[in-house]
């Protein structure tokens, strides 16, 4: 949570917090990556790897303006940079490659069957990126901007998730899923 600068690992069956990483600089998104946890840090403008076994921390990639959501993408990671309007691939060595640019405030990301889905926070557009082509597949109510530059770009992440054949869209202002 960016409010308390923690990333917590929780057992979903009973809600037990099994590990907590404290003192992070505005963590806004996290995902399991190999044997570690990848975290998008708005305050550091970076993606950090946390090792649950040892507690070690390592910056994997930096130089972002507003890293917003990090997910697994094939064997790598992708992160949305809301301010730059980019989706960036990060390999295991921290090398970055811009996959998509020219977006309007990319926030939530989801990946399935060689397609990457992107929620544009300012427009409400849900975009699909596949075979180097991008298309709008849906539009919902856009999100809101942060109240100050010290806060992450989106106070509430406009997120995406895929389960089975369905894409789930969390709408901040609509308060819907």
What name fits each language-model region?
Residues 1-177:
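Sequence-structural signature of mature extracellular/luminal beta-sheet repeat domains
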């Amino acid at each position: 949570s960016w409010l308390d600068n923690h990333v917590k690992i929780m057992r979903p069956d009973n809600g037990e917090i099994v590990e907590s990483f404290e003192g992070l600089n505005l963590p806004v998104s996290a995902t399991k990556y190999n044997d570690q946890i990848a975290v998008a840090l708005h305050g550091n403008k970076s993606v950090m790897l946390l090792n649950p076994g040892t507690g070690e921390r390592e910056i994997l990639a930096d130089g972002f303006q507003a890293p917003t959501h990090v997910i697994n993408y094939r064997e790598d990671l992708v992160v949305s940079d809301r301010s730059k309007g980019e989706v960036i691939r990060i390999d295991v060595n921290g090398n970055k490659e811009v996959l998509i640019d020219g977006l309007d405030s990319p926030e939530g990301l989801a990946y399935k069957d060689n397609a990457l889905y992107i929620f544009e926070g300012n427009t409400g557009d849900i975009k699909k990126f596949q075979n180097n082509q991008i298309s709008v597949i849906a539009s919902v109510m856009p999100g809101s901007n942060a109240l100050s530059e010290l806060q992450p770009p989106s106070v509430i992440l406009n997120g995406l998730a895929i389960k089975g054949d369905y894409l789930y869209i969390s709408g901040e202002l609509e308060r819907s899923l």
